Amino acid sequence: MTVQTAQIVKNYIGGEWVESISTKMEAVYNPATGEVIAQVPLSTKVDVEQAVLAANEAFKSWSKTAVPKRARILFKYQQLLVDNWEELAKLITIENGKSYNEAYGEVLRGIECVEFAAGAPTLMMGKQLPDIATGIESGMYRYPIGVIGGITPFNFPMMVPCWMFPLAIACGNTFVLKPSERTPLLAARLAELAEEAGLPKGVLNIVNGAHDVVNGLLEHKLVKAISFVGSQPVAEYVYKKGTENLKRVQALAGAKNHSIVLNDANLELATKQIISAAFGSAGERCMAASVVTVEEEIADQLVERLVAEANKIVIGNGLDEDVFLGPVIRDNHKERTIGYIDSGVEQGATLVRDGREDTAVKGAGYFVGPTIFDHVTKEMKIWQDEIFAPVLSIVRVKSLDEAIEIANESRFANGACIYTDSGASVRQFRETIESGMLGVNVGVPAPMAFFPFSGWKDSFYGDLHANGTDGVEFYTRKKMLTSRWEK
């Protein structure tokens, strides 16, 4: 599917591209230009019903398909993603807005997720104990659980779906995906390539839409589990409603990630990492560096370096060469971000770089320039809330103890980083910080697909995280077999 031909995005149900029964449509915009590039249907629960029934029917045979055969389809799928790498990256940039280089990297992360899922024969192995008692043996076997629902966000339209459905189907499940209505084109292309790889009809289905589709998945009795990535309020809603309907749920939510810079840090390295982590993907990622806590002795130096580097950032259409910072996703998100910048000024923070004044902000598209606040306190909204935009807050502290104390007061706990050369400081940070993914001299400590994406507190709802062995546990259930064999 190309942008030029995707005037109306269709649902993908039972291996067929079908129109939604809904007549309601929502425009899909190129956020760099404001141009409408497609129309996506706001599908209904009837559409969800059709997709779930197709997935449930496909489960009967797919769950019995030999695990190596499932893996071979995924290996072919991985190669097709590689073959179409540049096309996929361009499509991400057009509908999401991030720079082409970042989109290219996102495709890589998606491919890595498929590679991990293709290892299903090893991941699905059970356990055996031959002699739990005289002549008696016990074994554990893994089985798929059924139809899975996946609800994905706009900010990583390839990587997050590839977190979900490849591993789920590798484990023998079937899948109904609801991509973000803001970025549906990439999901459609993923389905086309899955079909080309030989994935049977009904194993992967896509229903486009908004609230009705989400509720349809959460309420349907044949949907056995829900994987969600998105904002904190919606994640909490999905978790509560899903579990009320007796579903297994993993819901990845918001973040307010703290980066701690100590006196012995390599400031050149710290500056480079923080700039990339704070302003990459326009700050629209749950691992973005949104708060820096820096020891007072080096605070002036760090702020000066950060502002100088932020001033060098090229802002514009992500398809243009040398652009680093693209737009935020929609005009209302741009206005929301400007509202947070206004509140930071009103609450007394020092605005040392004003992203409202960049030239690109005044033109077409939904641009906000890199914004840096100094002298931020934890009473301010810009410290408390997830802004999900290129806005960085700097808090000055007297010690590592104070920095950790401040970070731990946040209700979010996705990631945290420390910049230091001290092993003792790293150990203290590791043992006392309340966060699930940690970095040492690394700006974005997002793990590879074979490790769990492990947020804490209000950054995650559930027991089993996405990816890694947690993902395998989430998408499977166990049978225990105890046998007595006598001569």
UniProtKB/Swiss-Prot annotation:
Keywords: NAD, Oxidoreductase
EC number: 1.2.1.27
Residues at which NAD(+) binds: F154, K178, E181, R182, S231, E386
InterPro entries: Ald_DH/histidinol_DH (IPR016161), Ald_DH_C (IPR016163), Ald_DH_CS_CYS (IPR016160), Ald_DH_N (IPR016162), Aldehyde_DH_dom (IPR015590), MeMal-semiAld_DH (IPR010061), MSDH_GmP_bac (IPR023510)
Gene Ontology annotations of biological process type: inositol catabolic process; thymine catabolic process; valine catabolic process
Enzymatic reactions: 3-oxopropanoate + NAD(+) + CoA + H2O = hydrogencarbonate + acetyl-CoA + NADH + H(+); 2-methyl-3-oxopropanoate + NAD(+) + CoA + H2O = propanoyl-CoA + hydrogencarbonate + NADH + H(+)
Pfam families the record matches: Aldedh (PF00171)
PROSITE patterns in alphabetical order: ALDEHYDE_DEHYDR_CYS
Broad class of enzyme this protein falls into: oxidoreductase
Catalytic residues of the enzyme: C286 (nucleophile)
Subunit composition and interactions: Homotetramer.
NAD keyword on record: yes
Molecular functions per Gene Ontology: malonate-semialdehyde dehydrogenase (acetylating) activity; methylmalonate-semialdehyde dehydrogenase (acylating, NAD) activity
Name this protein carries in UniProt: Malonate-semialdehyde dehydrogenase 2
Record family assignment: Belongs to the aldehyde dehydrogenase family. IolA subfamily.
Involved pathway(s): Polyol metabolism; myo-inositol degradation into acetyl-CoA; acetyl-CoA from myo-inositol: step 7/7
